[in-house]
Amino acid sequence: MAGAKEIRNKIGSVKSTQKITKAMEMVAASKMRRSQESMEASRPYADTMRKVIGHLALGNLEYRHPYLEEREAKRVGYIVISSDRGLCGGLNINLFKKVMTEMKTWSEDGVEIDLAVIGSKATAFFNSYGGNVVAQNSGLGDHPSLEELIGTVGVMLKKYDEGQLDRLYVVNNKFINTMVQEPAIEQLLPLPKSEDEAMQRTHAWDYIYEPEPKPLLDALLVRYVESQVYQGVVENLACEHVARMIAMKAATDNAGDIIDELQLVYNKARQAAITQELSEIVSGASAV
């Protein structure tokens, strides 16, 4: 059994670690609340854009924008959104597993894949994995802006415009609640049609464009893609802070359990040492 002094040192070390994890838990909780507010503030815009675009995809336009046209998938692109920092449980690895499974399915069908990665964890993972990373972005911090994402999104849109991509997806963690965050893959291009049954009927919905649809659609559809990627970044950030808070709480609780176990071992060691000393005193007295 280890000596009492050694056990005391271990207890002190674990207590120091526990203070760090507790502080990180509190910081993550504070950041989580702020990121949730940002996420909730941006959701109405992103949801409305998605709804409008879903209607456009069902519309009957004389001008058919390339983003509305279905074509055979020979090469697909993924915009993968991860965190910049670790210590957030299995948040990133679960996301990577999901996208890797889908990429494997495409590869088995002979479809090539391009990747744009946002977040240093995704950059490190796919550079190590060997994926064809054509754009990367990291260091967005806790207050990402749309302007910081335009370059990365623009690379993928340019490839789509030039016919080098036939599908474009965004991959990120979806914030369900503080206990549930799920990895999700959503199609950006070609534009997904509205799932509203009322809109599926012929001529159920159409817009009137003045003076003409082309310049409006050219700007609107690019803005739609950018808004969905931005919403993905904001949601992923909220998921990151929640996951880190939960991971640090678990670490703090585990440290408490270890301290209790070490304290028990320490008490036993101290008791054994006292018993040994008493035995030696009694033996000495008997000898005299």
Swiss-Prot record:
Compartment(s) where it occurs, according to its Swiss-Prot or TrEMBL record: Cell inner membrane
Pfam families registered for this protein in UniProt: ATP-synt
Keyword field: ATP synthesis, Cell inner membrane, Cell membrane, CF(1), Hydrogen ion transport, Ion transport, Membrane, Transport
Keyword flag Membrane: yes
Membrane association type: Peripheral membrane protein
Gene Ontology CC: one annotated term: proton-transporting ATP synthase complex
GO biological process, one term: proton motive force-driven plasma membrane ATP synthesis
Keyword field contains Electron transport: no
InterPro entries: ATP_synth_F1_ATPase_gsu (IPR035968), ATP_synth_F1_gsu (IPR000131), ATP_synth_F1_gsu_CS (IPR023632)
Primary localisation category: membrane
Subunit structure and binding partners: F-type ATPases have 2 components, CF(1) - the catalytic core - and CF(0) - the membrane proton channel. CF(1) has five subunits: alpha(3), beta(3), gamma(1), delta(1), epsilon(1). CF(0) has three main subunits: a, b and c.
Family: Belongs to the ATPase gamma chain family.
Protein name, entry field: ATP synthase gamma chain
Originating organism: Aliivibrio fischeri (strain ATCC 700601 / ES114)
